[in-house]
């Protein structure tokens, strides 16, 4: 059985159960001559059980015969950090100048467990440090051990 020839990859962040032919999805898929309606239906069906509207990084593989497949990754760490800190956006200043919220070390550990499949480590402590670094970059103070 031979593999299909890959024409290209498209990286998009799409809200769960919220794929529509409107930009950015429509133009990105239209340039590769992919059936936009079929992608939107398949994506929305695949994300139906998830919380509506959460941002999902998605890698769409487009094949030469205009078919496609897609892989949904976990939401960005910044989304989870903002949710746990109950803020709408991170700090626009440097991390030492403006603290916009707080998260606990346990929150960071919980986010790290959710993000493990997409992080470049298999160690939960290293993953927690990665998430704590993201929190600091956003202007969040990490409290606890």
Curated annotation (Swiss-Prot):
Origin: domain of life: Bacteria
Keywords: Methylation, Ribonucleoprotein, Ribosomal protein, RNA-binding, rRNA-binding
InterPro entries: Ribosomal_uL11, Ribosomal_uL11_bac-typ, Ribosomal_uL11_C, Ribosomal_uL11_C_sf, Ribosomal_uL11_CS, Ribosomal_uL11_N, Ribosomal_uL11_N_sf
Keyword Ligase: no
Gene Ontology MF terms: large ribosomal subunit rRNA binding; structural constituent of ribosome
GO biological process: translation
Family, per entry: Belongs to the universal ribosomal protein uL11 family.
Matches recorded under PANTHER family: 60S RIBOSOMAL PROTEIN L12, LARGE RIBOSOMAL SUBUNIT PROTEIN UL11M
Name this polypeptide is given: Large ribosomal subunit protein uL11
Source species of the chain: Rickettsia canadensis (strain McKiel)
Gene that this polypeptide is encoded by: rplK
